[in-house]
A protein has these predicted regions:
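Solvent-exposed alpha-helix faces
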Residues: 45-46, 88
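A short N-terminal helical cap/helix-turn-helix that marks the beginning
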Residues: 55-59, 90-93
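Short arginine-rich
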Residues: 20-23, 48-58
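Short amphipathic alpha-helices within nucleic acid-binding modules
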Residues: 38-44
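Helix N-cap motif at beta-to-alpha junctions
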Residues: 36-37, 76
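C-terminal structural segments of small proteins and small subunits
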Residues: 67-93
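Short Gly/Ser/Thr- and Asp/Glu-enriched loop/turn motifs at secondary-structure junctions
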Residues: 25, 62-66
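N-terminal first-folded block
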Residues: 1-35
Length: 93
């Protein structure tokens, strides 16, 4: 997973290619809804494993069947290639 800093144009271009993700300030954000808490927690466990593999961890929260995920690269105080790569992997779950 590349830790490449992106220009604003590159960020906007890649964000436009992702479904249901949106740019919020310096973060890439998405909400996920599941049948119930157990399914939401199973999803979070899978995301945690992906995040550990990538050594890149989301800001997230969970309330019952909803999981909010925000991705950012603190090193750049912006969205980087790592965030887009992780978002795409999360979308494959």
């Amino acid at each position: 997973m590349s830790n490449e800093q992106l220009t604003d144009a590159e960020i906007n271009e890649q964000a436009a290619q992702l479904i249901d993700w949106e740019l919020q300030g310096e973060m890439l954000y998405r909400q996920f809804y599941f049948k119930d808490f157990i399914v939401a927690f199973e999803f979070m466990t899978k995301v945690a494993a992906l995040s550990e593999q990538a050594n890149h961890h989301p800001n997230w929260s969970n309330v019952y069947n909803k999981v909010d995920i925000a991705l950012t690269t603190h090193e750049f105080n912006s969205v980087s290639q790592r965030d887009f790569d992780l978002a795409r992997k999360i979308d494959q779950l």
